[in-house]
């Protein structure tokens, strides 16, 4: 009878550890997916840094400038 309780206790402990590990793994995967989703470009009406642009029709975001010398959106320092 004692052996049966020990086996049942070990089985219960195994199930508890397994569920705990699955919870931890799923929360870790959620954190990783949110972290990498932040790197994905978002849709916006203006062009971000290093985006190719036309000086005549600059669609760069505020604080970025597009010039003839540098036909890409770059940070506009001091203005």
From Swiss-Prot:
<dbReference type="GO" id="GO:0005576">
    <property type="term" value="C:extracellular region"/>
</dbReference>
<dbReference type="GO" id="GO:0090729">
    <property type="term" value="F:toxin activity"/>
</dbReference>
<keyword id="KW-0964">Secreted</keyword>
<feature type="modified residue" description="Alanine amide">
    <location>
        <position position="77"/>
    </location>
</feature>
<feature type="disulfide bond">
    <location>
        <begin position="46"/>
        <end position="61"/>
    </location>
</feature>
<keyword id="KW-0800">Toxin</keyword>
<feature type="signal peptide">
    <location>
        <begin position="1"/>
        <end position="19"/>
    </location>
</feature>
<feature type="disulfide bond">
    <location>
        <begin position="53"/>
        <end position="66"/>
    </location>
</feature>
<keyword id="KW-0732">Signal</keyword>
<dbReference type="Pfam" id="PF02950">
    <property type="entry name" value="Conotoxin"/>
</dbReference>
<keyword id="KW-0027">Amidation</keyword>
<protein>
    <recommendedName>
        <fullName>Orally active insecticidal peptide</fullName>
    </recommendedName>
</protein>
<dbReference type="GO" id="GO:0008200">
    <property type="term" value="F:ion channel inhibitor activity"/>
</dbReference>
<keyword id="KW-0872">Ion channel impairing toxin</keyword>
<comment type="function">
    <text>Probable ion channel inhibitor. Shows insecticidal activity when injected into mealworms.</text>
</comment>
<keyword id="KW-0960">Knottin</keyword>
<comment type="similarity">
    <text>Belongs to the neurotoxin 03 (Tx2) family. 01 subfamily.</text>
</comment>
<feature type="disulfide bond">
    <location>
        <begin position="60"/>
        <end position="73"/>
    </location>
</feature>
<feature type="propeptide">
    <location>
        <begin position="20"/>
        <end position="44"/>
    </location>
</feature>
<dbReference type="InterPro" id="IPR004214">
    <property type="entry name" value="Conotoxin"/>
</dbReference>
<keyword id="KW-1015">Disulfide bond</keyword>
